[in-house]
UniProtKB/Swiss-Prot annotation:
Cellular component GO terms held in the UniProt record: DNA-directed RNA polymerase complex
SMART domains: RPOLA_N
Its EC number(s): 2.7.7.6
Protein name: DNA-directed RNA polymerase subunit beta'
Self-association and partners: The RNAP catalytic core consists of 2 alpha, 1 beta, 1 beta' and 1 omega subunit. When a sigma factor is associated with the core the holoenzyme is formed, which can initiate transcription.
Cofactor(s) the protein needs: Mg(2+); Zn(2+)
Single GO MF descriptor: DNA binding
Cofactor binding notes: Binds 1 Mg(2+) ion per subunit. Binds 2 Zn(2+) ions per subunit.
């Protein structure tokens, strides 16, 4: 029995004609499909039941045998085997071709494999195959050469001249003969010799030919199998024909394509039998070749075959390629049972780990569970009556549903699922209505809001799946973001506003300065209405210190007392050992969004996830309650326009008039005038904003919303009540006419018109960049999907040195941020020689702070970049799992997490321009395209010139151009670089530079850096550049995610000289495999190969993976499969994608084999077993 778990690998290769006949159940001889009167398949046609099996279960074509009892009988009348109709999905047929036909993938692919083997150009090959020219097969004793092309006229001339002394042919037959004659071993030796001797184009061509020849030798494929004598016909249920309502038929395009092949083949047979003239036969053969081409890959050569309405027909290749192809549509994106979707509404009364499930949906989803429980409880006699009860929705069904649903988690997912927090598990609570209720705190993780978003529900069925959902996916366990380890469940909007209002204080309100003997008394006074929630009061606090009660009077407000009741009082914000501060409230200042984040971070670090979930719920209750009580809302009167605005605008007008006057007098250029005007207006806008902020009361609702981080920003307040300021035109150039009004006053027509440019551009950009970002994520996932934590420690001594990342004087990422949660690669010692962190220990927050204080600027840490694990990475090189704060577990799919961590904010960034309404500001265009350029390792736009040698800079300027010469006096070498017009220099005359330093401003080409400075420099450069883009957008991503992607980009070695190994020059080979091969060679006393590390872009790297299934499902499906088939590749099923494609459990997390092989044994059984074992051992010892 074929079981999915039973196989380790999957192999692809070329099929020989014998193999195709072996697969087949019979030959398809007629182009007929089904009889339109009886609607039964025609015999020997494309749907023939004799070949492919019966259309109805257990029933032959003529109806002589019906029922299961005749299973396996072959009907003597119609020849159909009595069996299940399902076999029509697996039984294949074949067509015996009257003339051989070339397989288009191997002719037209790039590079043309057939062309390389025969050493013919693709054009020459095409001429022969499509009957334009003759090719000499055997020159005999004539002056012709083998494989020489002859036109019709030349052929006739030579025929008259030499008669039968030479042989030439055309079409696939001739090519087949040439392919059969190839001696691969001999050719391989010749090519290897040629590679050693030749140079330039000739050598490159020889290397490419050798690659193909070697592939055929290693895989055991024969070259002539690229020519088809027999064409396989795929099972009929994979190319179905169905009857539509009006009696017409809809059929798969493949049937049309097969029909054309069969018609032409039959006609060719007839012509050959009749002995028709050569020219007619040749034309028919060419048509047959074209028909087979169209079937395999329509449109690859010439015009595609079209169906009704000029639509190109979908060929076998099209069935596989692209988003709608077999790989991405059906193998990686299956639809699943036990799922539903509905609109979401907010459920503030839920706990963090709960969600509201509509009753009718729950009943349908849990139907089998409910039916079983009904039978178990004796409410129904058997499953059939239980099913009827559920379908009629009897009242007793609801009680049973409640029981079934209890403790059975469900998964909620919102598309687009940009990171793993887009699917989480919740405990369902039945609700009336037809909407799913979602807890407000999980919205940020899903990026969900309640303006009509929909979510999907999935039910984990098996016990294992339920356990995983409960322990790994429950929302209460996913409080931290995997990308940076910060809490993702931070309160937002109303909750923030409520807490802000609650912890504010105000002067001159009732009850100010009163004393209370305890917090409880203060609360009572507030509830009875004697004091205001914001009044500054004195309260006597009592605490137990070292077993004795002590008390002290502190100043606070009732609001702060209420807020502190919701959070633990040991978070370390207050020094509890100092008697001065020991009695203070943990949080005694104004709480805004960032402060809430810090509080939750501490709660998680100190008390763990369960307590954090409780605290979150308490903060949520408080927030909603007090934002309601405060009744904060926006009204037009809250938008206070500052009095100074008029004066500031007048000053600006005068300033602009002065600038214009200077320009007219010719004192400044047009460019300077423009810059100055823009600068003036920007300053004015700033001043107006400052005046506005000073005017607003601190209890002004709009100010509170922005200041607390609940909603809106300073920028938006400026537009409401200050002035909108400068706008950009469609090209992105800033229009020098500012918008003086704000939305409170209203814009005039011209101002409104100017502002539409920015708004429209914002929307268009958003739409485009969302797509770009999604595509970037897809490539990142594909390149890193097989990186899984596979071992404890790879044992390497290597590591990378990290220091803070700076851009000019600005620190982009602090050193402590970069080393927290990483493993030290060597002892970290302060100046006095005290060890702060030992080698192979994790650096935590406190230690990182110590390192900072000790003034250490460079630290060596373990990194995925230097990890020696063959597949994936080890725990030590990866360090802390950011989502849990512990050392990463074996089996964690860190590659996919890395891709999501980088891709998810990509989309966030892309969606950012949209909210400001298009006010001129920093656009992310340097953002996303820059990240893409780095990961694809492209030559960047605005290239910086870098020096290849170290030395002193000499700058020479002649009339037309500037040159920089770098002189290395020690080794007496110098190099001169031409500086393009308009570049800004980064160096001064006489300055000393290192090899690899930039001479001009701009981005460095990573490939040049790799050549000059080596691997470490490139890795560090890519990492820092990617970080700069994200940090400038205010997005934090941990280094290790970017390191994993860079590791995947640099996994391969490009072989330069193969030595005596079997590798080919110019071949890309896995670094570890390269080292292995060399080790083997050295052991045998042979010459090892030399090579250099290659830097591949993520697309290239994803296509260069060992798994052909993963590569084929990514991009360029036909090219990948062609290549894999010739090489006879074996896919070892190591990554995640390949296993999903063939339907095995993925080898990550609980699917890792080390976890799958665990069996659960009862304790008593185990003890018994051990006793028996012990007795056996004792008996053996005594004997």
């Amino acid at each position: 029995m074929f079981k999915l778990k039973n196989f380790e690998a999957i192999k692809i290769g070329l099929a020989s004609p014998e193999k195709i006949r072996e697969w087949s159940r019979g030959e398809v001889k007629k182009p007929e499909t089904i009889n339109y009167r009886t609607l039964k398949p025609e015999r020997d046609g494309l749907f023939c039941e004799r070949i492919f099996g019966p259309t109805k279960d257990w029933e032959c074509h003529c109806g002589k045998y019906k029922r299961v009892k005749y299973k396996g009988v072959v009907c003597d009348r119609c020849g159909v085997e009595v069996t299940r109709s399902k076999v029509r999905r697996e039984r294949m047929g074949h067509i015996e071709l009257a003339a051989p036909v070339a397989h288009i993938w191997y002719v037209k692919g790039i590079p043309s494999r057939m062309g390389l083997l025969l050493d013919m150009s693709p054009r020459a090959l095409e001429k022969v195959l499509y009957f334009v020219s003759y090719v000499v097969i055997d020159p005999g004793d004539t002056p012709l050469t083998k494989k020489q092309l002859l036109s019709e006229k030349e052929y006739r001339e030579y025929l008259e001249k030499y008669g039968n002394r030479f042989r030439a042919g055309m079409g696939a037959e001739a090519i087949k003969e040439l392919l059969q004659e190839i001696d691969l071993e001999k050719l391989s030796k010749e090519l290897r010799a040629e590679i050693k001797e030749s140079t330039g184009q000739k050598r490159v061509r020889a290397i490419r030919r050798l690659e193909v020849v070697q592939a055929f030798i290693d895989s055991g494929n024969r070259p002539e199998w690229m020519i088809l004598e027999v064409l396989p016909v795929i099972p009929p249920d994979l190319r179905p024909m169905v009857q539509l309502d009006g009696g017409r038929f809809a059929t798969s395009d493949l049937n049309d394509l097969y029909r054309r092949v069969i018609n032409r083949n039959n006609r060719l047979k007839k012509l050959l039998d009749l002995g028709a003239p050569d020219i007619i036969v040749r034309n028919e053969k060419r048509m047959l070749q074209e028909a087979v081409d169209a079937l395999i890959d329509n449109g690859r050569r010439g015009r595609p075959v079209t169906g009704p309405g000029n639509r190109p027909l979908k060929s076998l290749s099209d069935m596989l390629k692209g988003k709608q192809g077999r790989f991405r549509q059906n193998l990686l994106g299956k639809r699943v049972d036990y799922s539903g979707r509905s609109v979401i509404v907010v459920g503030p009364e839920l706990k963090v780990y709960q969600c509201g499930l509509p009753k009718e949906m729950a009943l349908e989803l849990f139907k089998p569970f409910v039916m079983k429980r009904l039978v178990d409880k004796g409410l129904a006699q058997h499953i059939k009556s239980a099913k009827r009860m559920v379908e009629r929705v009897r009242p007793e069904v609801w009680d049973v549903l409640e029981e079934v649903i209890k403790e059975h988690p469900v998964l909620l997912n919102r598309a687009p699922t940009l990171h793993r927090l887009g699917i989480q598990a919740f405990e369902p609570v039945l609700v009336e209505g037809r909407a799913i209720k979602l807890h407000p705190l999980v919205c940020p993780a899903y990026n969900a809001d309640f303006d009509g978003d929909q979510m999907a529900v999935h039910i984990p069925l098996s016990m294992e799946a339920q356990a995983e959902a409960r322990f790994l996916m429950l929302a209460a366990n996913n409080i931290l973001k995997p990308q940076d380890g910060k809490p993702v469940m931070t309160p937002t909007q109303d909750m923030v506003l409520g807490c802000y209002y609650l912890t504010a204080d105000e002067d001159g309100v009732p009850g100010e300065g009163k004393y209370f003997s305890s917090p409880e008394e203060a609360l009572m006074a507030y509830q009875l209405g004697y004091i205001h929630i914001h009044a500054k009061i004195k309260v006597k606090m009592t605490r137990e210190i070292n077993g004795e009660k002590k008390s002290k009077v502190i100043e606070t407000t009732v609001g702060k007392i209420i807020f502190n009741e919701a959070i633990p009082q040991d978070l370390g914000f207050v020094d509890r050992n100092n008697p001065e501060t020991a009695f203070n409230l943990e949080i005694n200042d104004l709480v805004d969004k960032s402060k809430l984040g810090k509080i939750l971070d501490r709660v998680y670090r100190i008390h763990g996830p369960t307590k954090t979930a409780e605290t979150l719920d308490k903060i949520k209750e408080l927030g909603f309650k007090y934002s309601t009580k405060a009744a904060i809302t926006i009204s037009v009167s809250d938008m206070v326009i500052p009095k100074e605005k008029e004066k500031l605008l007048k000053e600006a007008d005068e300033m602009v008039a002065k600038i214009e006057a200077q320009f007219r007098r010719g004192l400044i250029s047009e460019e300077e005038r423009y810059e100055k005007v823009i600068e003036t207006w920007n300053m004015t806008t700033e001043k107006v904003t400052e005046a506005l902020m000073a005017t607003l009361d601190k209890f002004n609702p709009i100010f509170m919303m922005a200041h607390s981080g609940a909603r809106g920003s300073k920028n938006q307040i400026r537009q409401l009540a200050g002035m909108r300021g400068l706008m950009a035109d469609p090209s992105g150039r800033i229009i020098e006419l500012p918008i003086r009004s704000n939305f409170r006053e209203g814009l005039n027509v011209l101002e409104f018109f100017i502002s539409t440019h920015g708004a429209r551009k914002g929307l268009a950009d958003t739409a485009l960049r969302t797509a770009d970002s999604g595509y970037l994520t897809r490539r990142l996932v594909d390149v890193s999907q097989d990186v899984i934590v596979r071992e404890e420690d790879c044992g390497t001594d290597e590591g990378i040195y990290v220091e803070e990342i700076r851009e000019g004087n600005e620190i982009i990422e602090k050193l402590s941020d970069r080393i927290i949660g990483r493993i030290a690669a060597e002892d970290i010692v302060d100046s006095e020689g005290n060890v702060i962190v030992r080698r192979n220990e994790m650096i935590n927050e406190e230690e990182a702070e110590k390192i900072d204080k000790a003034g250490i600027t460079r630290v060596k840490i373990r990194s995925p970049l230097t990890c020696r694990s063959r597949h994936g990475v080890c725990r030590m090189c990866y360090g802390r799992d950011l989502a849990t704060g512990e050392l990463v577990n074996i089996g964690e799919a860190v590659g996919i997490i890395a891709a999501q961590a980088i891709g998810e904010p990509g989309t966030q960034l892309t969606m950012r321009t949209f909210h400001t309404g298009g006010v001129a500001g920093v656009d992310i265009t340097q953002g996303l395209p820059r990240v893409e350029e780095l990961f694809e390792a492209r030559k960047p736009k605005g290239l910086a010139v870098i020096t290849e040698i170290s030395g002193v800079v000499r700058i020479n300027e002649s009339k037309k151009r500037r040159e920089i010469t770098v002189v290395d006096e020690e080794n007496n070498i110098s190099k001169t670089y031409l500086i393009p017009y308009g570049s800004r220099l980064k160096v001064r005359d006489g300055q000393w530079v290192q090899a690899g330093d930039e001479l001009t401003e701009g981005s460095v080409n990573p490939h040049d850096l790799l050549k000059i400075k080596g691997i470490y420099a490139v890795q560090s450069y890519l990492l820092q550049e990617v970080q700069k883009v994200y940090r400038l957008q205010g997005v934090e991503i941990n280094d290790k995610h970017i390191e994993i992607i860079i590791r995947q980009m640099m996994k391969k070695v490009k072989v330069e000289d193969p030595g005596d190994t079997s590798m080919l020059p110019g071949e890309l080979i896995d670094m570890f495999k390269f080292e292995e091969e060399n080790k083997k060679a050295i052991e045998k006393g042979l010459r090892p190969a030399t090579g250099r590390r290659a830097l591949l872009g993520i697309t290239k790297a994803a296509l260069a993976t060992d798994s052909f299934l993963s590569a084929a499902s990514f991009q360029e499906t036909t090219r990948v499969l062609t290549d894999a088939a010739i090489k006879g590749k074996v896919d070892p099923l190591i990554g995640l994608k390949e296993n999903v494609i063939i339907g095995k459990l993925i080898p990550a997390g609980t699917g890792l084999s080390r976890y799958r092989n665990i069996t659960v044994v009862k304790k008593e059984d185990q003890e018994k077993k051990e006793e028996v074992k012990k007795e056996a051992v004792d008996a053996k010892a005594s004997s």
